[in-house]
């Protein structure tokens, strides 16, 4: 009995130490799950090939993200840190599940421009632990890609719009790895 109790406690400690585990792995090395609390760490990337067509240029002020396996290619996301937000377009897949496991949290991989807009820094790595909120935009959202600020009420509306947009893409099987089933 004591050994079983000890093993239970040990497994809880190990689980807490490693924290994050992807609820829905996909494509062999990525996570298709979205964060239930909409919280992610922000990382930046540039110069890779794109899972969604032509790769975006790394020069200029471009607002793009990876995470197509979660949200779908071409979807628009609102990425917010506090009341500062950026509307971006999903252009690529990623990051790898092992990166999120090492970070201990789901990650939104975004353009260097988004990193700068939301943090003021020149780069964002998972170890920086820049926490952001990510929501899918409403289909009727006419806001252009780029930075904007929100009030508390507007932030609440972003969450409502996200739930509606995710329900639509799940029904269409264009997000959360539904195309794998």
From Swiss-Prot:
Q: Where in or outside the cell?
A: Cytoplasmic vesicle lumen
Record's comment on post-translational modification: Contains six disulfide bonds.
Q: Which molecular-function annotations from GO does this UniProt entry contain?
A: lysozyme activity
Write down what this protein is called. Lysozyme C
Gene Ontology terms describing biological process: defense response to Gram-positive bacterium; killing of cells of another organism; peptidoglycan catabolic process
What is the protein's species of origin? Dictyostelium discoideum (Social amoeba)
Q: What top-tier enzyme class does this entry carry?
A: hydrolase
Give the source's domain of life in one word.
Eukaryota
Give the gene that encodes this protein. alyC
Signal peptide positions (record): 1-19
Could you list this entry's UniProt keywords, alphabetically sorted. Answer: Antibiotic, Antimicrobial, Bacteriolytic enzyme, Cytoplasmic vesicle, Disulfide bond, Glycosidase, Hydrolase, Signal
Q: What does this protein do?
A: Has antibacterial activity.
- Family of this protein: Belongs to the dictyostelium lysozyme family.
Q: Where is the organism placed in the taxonomic lineage, from the top? A: Eukaryota, Amoebozoa, Evosea, Eumycetozoa, Dictyostelia
- What's the EC number here? 3.2.1.17
The catalytic activity, as recorded, is: Hydrolysis of (1->4)-beta-linkages between N-acetylmuramic acid and N-acetyl-D-glucosamine residues in a peptidoglycan and between N-acetyl-D-glucosamine residues in chitodextrins
Please report the propeptide residues according to the UniProt annotation: 139-181
Q: Which cellular components does GO assign to this protein?
A: cytoplasmic vesicle; cytoplasmic vesicle lumen; vesicle lumen
